[in-house]
Amino acid sequence: MTTHVILVARAFGAKGVYIEGKDEKMVKSILKVIDSWGGSSYFLVKEIENGKSIVNEWKEKGGTIIHLTMYGININDFQDRFEKIKYPLLIIVGAEKVEGWYYHNADYNIAIGNQPHSEVAALAIFLDRIYKGRELYMEFEDAKIKILPQKAGKKVIRSG
Amino acid sequence: MTTHVILVARAFGAKGVYIEGKDEKMVKSILKVIDSWGGSSYFLVKEIENGKSIVNEWKEKGGTIIHLTMYGININDFQDRFEKIKYPLLIIVGAEKVEGWYYHNADYNIAIGNQPHSEVAALAIFLDRIYKGRELYMEFEDAKIKILPQKAGKKVIRSG
């Protein structure tokens, strides 16, 4: 699941990910995707021991902490505030149980609907909303593989 | 992963899912979520042997077959046609390799951006776009658990 979250982060316009815990095999597979499809020059993949220190650092930098949780405020009711929130954004998504600390230290707890579904979907929808869909036109200059969109079938250009 | 796809289908407004293959444990866990959070009256969860027969039946019924694939046409370039496509929609998402047959028998091959990421995210974005975000206000009459959105922390009403 974490792999899908990270691939969504990259494909939907995030600048990188902090991953709590250690998973060498997963990081290796991610770096392979980035090497082929692009993003090596800027997309950060960092394993960390404790997310709380990152949250505190982020606050000191003057950024905004967004926690995506089904218990939060519906994103539809938050949409008009997107323009005013201070960047950079740190977006927190949790797999299983997320500690209460994050709820109380996030600037905003935002729900992608108040129903159980998936942190993968939650991150995708949030990024799609803040970038207003433009992220889906992203091109990666250092990509070795590029897709030529097709009505049916597959067309890919390979370089490098 | 299939569990996440199904939870997204339910939470984002689909009427049900056909799952190719057999996975009793997974179906049981899904039905448990539906029993608690609602949707039992209409949300179909059906295991099937072969997706192709469903596609053919769907066509005979006059519905539209949408295949979500990174090789397809960017959803942003398809958006204006949403109003004209004939319902009901059968949306095909594949985990690993999807057979060429589906590419050539779908009415539309649509890409949620032409980058590798996740079928979970692809389905969520597609449904969010066709329902214009309204699906995130969905309420389930038969729900035994309901969330009261909170700025911080969790508030849930349990009934039945």
UniProtKB/Swiss-Prot annotation, chains A, B:
GO biological process: tRNA nucleoside ribose methylation
Entry-linked Pfam families: Trm56 (PF01994)
Reactions catalysed according to its record: cytidine(56) in tRNA + S-adenosyl-L-methionine = 2'-O-methylcytidine(56) in tRNA + S-adenosyl-L-homocysteine + H(+)
Enzyme Commission identifier(s): 2.1.1.206
Gene Ontology molecular-function annotations: tRNA (cytidine(56)-2'-O)-methyltransferase activity
Enzyme class, spelled out: transferase
A GO CC term attached to the entry: cytoplasm
Subcellular location(s) of the protein: Cytoplasm
Amino-acid positions noted as binding S-adenosyl-L-methionine in the UniProt annotation, renumbered to this chain: 68, 94-98, 112-119
UniProt keywords, alphabetically: Cytoplasm, Methyltransferase, S-adenosyl-L-methionine, Transferase, tRNA processing
Assigned protein family: Belongs to the aTrm56 family.
Subunit description: Homodimer.
Described function: Specifically catalyzes the AdoMet-dependent 2'-O-ribose methylation of cytidine at position 56 in tRNAs.
Protein name, UniProt field: tRNA (cytidine(56)-2'-O)-methyltransferase
Organism expressing this protein natively: Saccharolobus solfataricus (strain ATCC 35092 / DSM 1617 / JCM 11322 / P2)
